[in-house]
Regions:
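Alpha-helical transmembrane segments of integral membrane proteins
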Residues: 2-3, 94, 98-131, 172-314
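Hydrophobic alpha-helical transmembrane segments of membrane transport/permease proteins
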Residues: 16-69, 162-180
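Juxtamembrane/transmembrane-helix interface segments of polytopic membrane transporters
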Residues: 23-27, 32, 151, 155-159, ...
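Membrane-water interface segments at the C-terminal ends of transmembrane alpha-helices
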Residues: 23-29, 58, 73, 137-166, ...
Length: 314
């Protein structure tokens, strides 16, 4: 197990280096830069000389590889640079946005599991009955609607019509303001989880070990809760790994619509303003999160399924 974890950790280094280099290259091949965006949005009639002086101050006049090597050296020494727009340290700004994103992630994951797991199990156990049809219809509807559309619907009904929930924000009342963005994410995630859980449970119910258990006189509930659900956990872990990775990276559309002051909104604002150091910090964060979450998922697989453990040992 230790050898497996060490090997996966070593693999993180070239992956993150490759992703950061690619994102850095893409940003610098795009037309314009942070200076153009900053002065075009805040000032009028600014001379090219002033812009060039600002570029020299930020190091944007240097060759691409020089800029990348300086940035990489700073990251390796713990300095992620200064935001071009706010003038504040990138690391401090990024860390300050994480609590809001983590809070939204936790509420969405918990609510999704509370809804999707029992409904997915019920749909499988009552296959091709009225309850199954109703659950599958709800899942289909949830999958058919994009997050921005669900966000606007929830805002219209709960904030504008009923006026029972705030439209946006995070600071004043986090317990209340998190409801609408959480519902938006939950509708999308629960619909996907529900379908996958139903399919997985049905597959497990038709396997030989289930039929063998019934032949030996073991009760259906015992087989279901001790064997079928345990085997189905692998699917749930896979779904969680994908969801946690994307949610920790911030759901840009949902956070922007609800003005949720998290990592996703920060990334959108940084891309709009061409804030290269902040964008690179976001790229590093996303790369690390996806690799780390997948590593944790692989470790969980080995504990839940001995066959995977044996394959790793071989």
């Amino acid at each position: 197990m230790k050898k497996f974890i060490f090997k996966r950790l070593i693999q993180i280094i070239p992956i993150i280096l490759g992703i950061t280099f690619l994102s850095f290259a893409l940003m610098h091949t795009a037309a314009g830069d942070a200076v153009d965006t900053l002065y075009d949005s805040n000032s009028s009639g600014v001379s090219e000389q002033i812009k060039e002086e600002r570029r020299a101050e930020l190091g944007l006049d240097q060759p691409f590889m020089v800029q990348y090597s300086k940035w990489l050296k700073g990251v390796l020494t713990g300095d992620m640079g200064i935001s071009y727009i706010s003038g504040k340290p990138v690391f401090e700004t990024f860390i300050s946005k994480l609590p809001a994103t983590i809070y939204l992630m936790l509420t969405s994951i918990v609510l999704t599991l509370l809804i999707a797991v029992p409904l997915g199990i019920l749909a499988a156990r009552y296959r091709n009955r009225l309850l199954d049809y109703c659950i599958r219809f709800l899942s289909f509807m949830g999958n058919s609607m994009p997050n921005f559309f669900v966000s606007l619907l929830l805002i219209y009904f709960f904030a504008l019509k009923l006026k029972v929930l705030p439209v946006m924000g995070y600071g004043r009342s986090p317990l209340v303001s998190v409801i609408l963005p959480t519902l938006t994410l939950t509708i999308s995630m629960a619909s996907k989880y529900l379908r996958q859980i139903r399919v997985t449970v049905l597959e497990e119910m038709n396997k030989d070990y289930v039929l063998g258990g019934k032949a030996r006189g073991i009760r259906d509930n015992v087989i279901f809760y001790r064997s079928i659900l345990k085997s189905s956990m692998l699917t749930i872990i896979t779904l969680l790994a994908l969801s946690i990775g994307s949610l920790l990276g911030g759901t840009a559309i949902v956070e922007s619509i609800f003005m949720w002051d998290g990592v996703g909104k920060l990334a959108v604002d940084s891309i709009t303003m061409r804030d290269y150091p902040m964008i690179q910090a976001y790229v590093i964060w996303m790369s690390f999160i996806y690799v780390a979450v997948n590593l944790i998922a692989d470790i969980a697989y080995q504990y839940l399924d001995p066959r995977i453990r044996l394959n790793q040992e071989d």
